[in-house]
Curated annotation (Swiss-Prot):
GO biological process assignments: division septum assembly; FtsZ-dependent cytokinesis
HAMAP family in UniProt: ZapC
Main location (coarse class): cytoplasm
A GO CC annotation given for this chain: cytoplasm
Location(s) in or outside the cell: Cytoplasm
Superkingdom, taxonomy of origin: Bacteria
Subunit architecture: Interacts directly with FtsZ.
Pfam families: ZapC_C, ZapC_N
Function in brief: Contributes to the efficiency of the cell division process by stabilizing the polymeric form of the cell division protein FtsZ. Acts by promoting interactions between FtsZ protofilaments and suppressing the GTPase activity of FtsZ.
Record's protein name: Cell division protein ZapC
Family: Belongs to the ZapC family.
Species of origin: Pseudoalteromonas atlantica (strain T6c / ATCC BAA-1087)
Keywords: Cell cycle, Cell division, Cytoplasm, Septation
Length: 178
């Protein structure tokens, strides 16, 4: 897995938020600039706080048992870190999802169930921030249709009430257990 280092820095170029990872590697965040705030006007170092978010989420996902390639994991980690640092607050969309009798998260992973029964697919999300009764999530499913007029894309941000979150329990292989 790619680990943060002191040479990484955020910047904007050609209407994109980017992270220079050194060695000619550049990460481009999937978020439109209109949805971001506090953008760097020049190079902005990947901070200690960014590193803490990145590493904490990496540990959580590793413990969850979710099977991801190194590339998928790094992409999720970088997108989540960028969202926490730069994404504008988003509006609640709880009415799109069913209230759950047993709700919560498991190692920051959760599922969302659309209220529209014509769309039975669950969307898998990572909870990147929780405050009070709400959760800000990032979709990690490839896409997620919740009704005939609304479809979310991978890495799109979704904010819901905590009672909409279904804990995503993944089988943990024996070799991952302590």
């Amino acid at each position: 897995m790619l680990l943060p280092n002191t040479n990484w820095f955020w910047y904007t170029h050609e209407n994109e938020l980017r992270l220079d990872l050194g060695d000619t590697l550049t990460f481009v965040a999937p978020f439109a600039l209109k949805n971001l705030v506090n953008l760097p006007s020049d190079k902005q170092l990947f901070s200690l706080e960014d590193t803490e978010h990145y590493v904490a989420l990496a540990e959580s996902l590793d413990n969850s048992g979710l099977e991801l390639s190194d590339g998928e994991l790094v992409q999720i980690l970088l997108n989540a870190t960028a969202a926490l640092k730069f994404h504008k607050p988003i509006g609640m969309k709880s009415w799109l999802y069913k209230t759950q009798s047993t709700s919560g998260v498991h190692y920051q992973l959760a599922l969302l169930e659309p209220t529209d029964t014509a769309y039975p697919e669950l969307g898998q999300v990572i909870v990147i921030e929780q405050d009070g009764a709400c959760a800000t999530c990032m979709l990690i499913s490839n896409e997620f249709a919740v009704n005939s007029s609304k479809k979310f894309s991978k890495f799109e941000m979704i904010k819901v009430m905590n009672d909409r979150l279904i804990p995503c329990l993944v089988d943990i292989p024996v070799y991952k257990r302590a």
